[in-house]
Amino acid sequence: MVHFQPQLDSLNNIEGAKLCEHKMAVTPDLEPCDFDSDSRWVRGIADLVIINKSKAFVVDYKTGSAKYPDRGQLELMALMVFKHFPEVKRVKAALVFMVHNKVIKAEYTSVGDDLMWDSWKSRVALLDGSFDNDQWPPKPNGLCRNWCPVEHCEYHGD
């Protein structure tokens, strides 16, 4: 625990209400709802949310490698903070890779959040279509050459 103390102390020193393992969800109409609501469309749990008037901080602790950080997770948590805490206009977010002492930062404002939500809705619509039709179009990536078990894929071995 001593190894992580400096990171934890710096977060603890940020002013505001601290919410640990904070659960958030929104409906398809982007209205905030209970995490377990049957009407939820998307939900997530933020490791730490700090609310300080019109500003918020969102932190997600990681123990793995920082080689491929997923900033999308930060964006989604920030968007849900804007819905659950309408007074918040700016979110500073971070993936904190504890073991590697690396921090990936991002900042979001509530201005233009409709465009970010539209992007998420498009991504979900693609997934919904794949689930509904059991169609999963192949997409080449770095695993195709040596790691993909689907040998009949057009990209296998690329």
What are these regions (language model features)?
Residues 1-158:
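RecB-family 4Fe-4S metal-dependent nuclease core
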